[in-house]
Curated annotation (Swiss-Prot):
Record-annotated DNA-binding residue ranges: 4-23
Organism of this sequence: Salmonella typhimurium (strain LT2 / SGSC1412 / ATCC 700720)
Subunit: Homodimer.
Name of protein: HTH-type transcriptional regulator GalR
Domain HTH lacI-type: 1-56
Role: Repressor of the galactose operon. Binds galactose as an inducer.
Gene3D superfamilies, per the entry: 3.40.50.2300, lambda repressor-like DNA-binding domains
Entry GO MF terms: DNA-binding transcription factor activity; transcription cis-regulatory region binding
PANTHER family reported in the protein's UniProt record: HTH-TYPE TRANSCRIPTIONAL REGULATOR GALR (PTHR30146:SF98), LACI-RELATED TRANSCRIPTIONAL REPRESSOR (PTHR30146)
């Protein structure tokens, strides 16, 4: 891999001159710019975005990396961070990581190139060591929905395992023992922790786990449809299903309705997140509230404080989810008809 010294040698200039060209300094002559640019292209040299940005004066811009801004969950996150930016006189720049390591890196580097001194980052695919390196370079970078060992005080996260345990326990408390689970097929900690929470609740109540009652899909409505279709295809040996998120629950509910399976009379359904769709499906969805607005607000305020070198307490910011009772859960009945709803 080419270095800045290789570029200087090929261009016939000093390393300092290469640095001035990279940082767009007015002290760099046009001849130097041409020579350095040509050398960089010949060597396929890409200057470190972090080093360039840190060498320049930061702007009043708050950066945010999300999984996918079209997802209602991330839409709520964006709105919360935008409010913090507005009230503190900052602009907001947004990058999408799409749950892909390379795209997450590109989104972060793009925001750094725009000299965002404060960053709120939702990145699930970049390895811990690489994220830790980035956070050491960028004092105002805060992670949301992830805990990084050694940097816990710069992370804002949810106890996902507890949330899934809470959802499954609620179904058990209503009398269900044959409980399915629809899980995200993304290899991220959220999916792993929520699946563990489901199994925890079953084990705590001495209910044998049945892997045939667990299906996986994309964490959206179509993924929920596919997963519920698969569950039904295995035989309807369940009276309740917990879902990875509300979008999957909405898709699953649609499949149940299409197949003439009543919710909650024949199958109870519980989601996770408490996004907008949970209040507009019919029946309205019982779910687990993810306090994303509060969490995103705290993450943005923390990032700005760190970027401004303000003293902040070195505490772990882990939030606990809560149960939201609506109308998609009831007690199971032998006849499959509605008994009581919450």
């Amino acid at each position: 891999m080419a270095t800045i010294k290789d570029v200087a040698r090929l261009a016939g200039v000093s390393v300092a001159t290469v640095s001035r060209v990279i940082n767009d300094s007015p002290k760099a002559s046009e001849a130097s710019r041409l020579a350095v640019t040509s050398a960089m292209e010949s060597l396929s040299y890409h200057p470190n975005a972090n080093a360039r940005a840190l060498a320049q004066q930061a702007t009043e811009t708050l950066g945010l990396v999300v999984g996918d801004v079209s997802d209602p969950f991330f839409g709520a996150m964006v709105k919360a961070v935008e409010q913090v930016a507005y009230h503190t006189g900052n602009f907001l720049l947004i990058g999408n990581g799409y749950h892909n390591e390379q795209k997450e890196r590109q989104a972060i580097e793009q925001l750094i190139r725009h000299r965002c001194a404060a960053l709120v980052v939702h990145a699930k695919m970049i390895p811990d060591a690489d994220l830790a390196s980035l956070m050491k370079q960028i004092p105002g970078m805060v992670l949301i929905n992830r805990i990084l060992p050694g940097l816990e005080h710069r992370c804002v996260a949810l106890d996902d395992r507890y949330g899934a345990w809470l959802a499954t326990r609620h179904l058990i408390q209503q009398g269900h023992t044959r409980i399915g689970y629809i899980c995200s097929n993304h290899t991220i900690s959220d999916a792993e922790d929520r699946l563990r929470g489901y199994y925890d609740a079953l084990a705590e109540s001495h209910i044998p786990a049945n892997d045939r009652l667990v299906t996986f899909g994309e964490p959206d409505e179509s993924g929920g449809e596919q997963a519920m279709t698969e569950l039904l295809g295995r035989g309807r040996n369940f009276t309740a299903v917990a879902c990875y998120n509300d979008s999957m629950a909405a898709g699953a509910m649609g499949v149940l309705n299409d197949n003439g399976v009543g919710v909650p009379g024949e199958v109870s359904l519980i989601g996770f997140d408490d996004v907008l769709v949970s209040r507009y499906v019919r029946p309205r969805l019982t779910t687990i509230r993810y306090p994303i607005v509060t969490m995103a607000t705290q993450a943005a305020e923390l990032a700005l404080a760190l970027a401004g070198k303000c003293p902040t307490p070195e505490v772990t910011h882990v939030f606990s989810p809560t149960l939201v009772r609506r109308h998609s859960v009831s007690t199971p009945t032998d006849t499959g008809h509605l008994s009581t709803t919450d």
